[in-house]
């Protein structure tokens, strides 16, 4: 046991910096809170849901809990600013069996997290989520995809978020 202790002691970071205290680690703080969500389905009907975003793990990560009002679609994400890589990373999972990984961060007055995938039939697809029109009590979230390497983007889903009181 004594032979192992020096290895752990040597590996510790003795700096006085608080983990996740960089300005970049706070770039997504606008998202923290409880939100009402609304969108139009393919037939033009208004659909609703809720989304709760919490700081977890000592403020080092964000946990998202999304649910449609009828409970038919439920998902979670975990987001963290990766100081070594210099960008945000997010992992999304949901009750459809999806597991999606994104990277990105602020881009002007928006936040963009994106990913690239190759389908089973060999097609290359780019996907991104865009947080825009960010205000203290509201923002717009767009889910877009591109099949031509980002030359054109198709809007697949727009959610309007308003903060719960």
What are these regions (language model features)?
Residues 1-6:
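Bacterial N-terminal signal peptides
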Residues 10-165:
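Hydrophobic small-molecule pocket/channel-lining residues, especially in calycin-type beta-barrels
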């Amino acid at each position: 046991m004594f032979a192992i202790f020096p290895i752990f002691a040597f590996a510790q970071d003795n700096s006085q910096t608080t983990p996740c205290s960089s300005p970049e680690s706070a770039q997504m703080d606008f998202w923290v809170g409880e939100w009402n969500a609304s969108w139009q389905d393919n037939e033009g009907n208004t659909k609703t849901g809720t989304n709760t975003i919490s700081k977890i793990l000592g403020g080092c990560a964000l946990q998202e809990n999304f649910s449609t009002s009828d409970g038919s679609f439920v998902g979670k994400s975990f987001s963290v600013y990766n100081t070594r890589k210099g960008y945000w990373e997010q992992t999304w999972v949901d009750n459809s069996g999806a597991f999606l990984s994104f990277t990105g961060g602020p881009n002007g007055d928006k936040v963009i997290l994106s990913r690239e995938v190759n389908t089973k039939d060999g097609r290359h697809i780019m996907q991104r989520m865009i947080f825009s029109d960010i205000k203290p009590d509201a923002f717009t979230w767009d889910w877009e995809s591109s099949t031509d390497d980002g030359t054109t983007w198709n809007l697949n889903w727009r959610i309007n978020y308003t903060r719960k009181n």
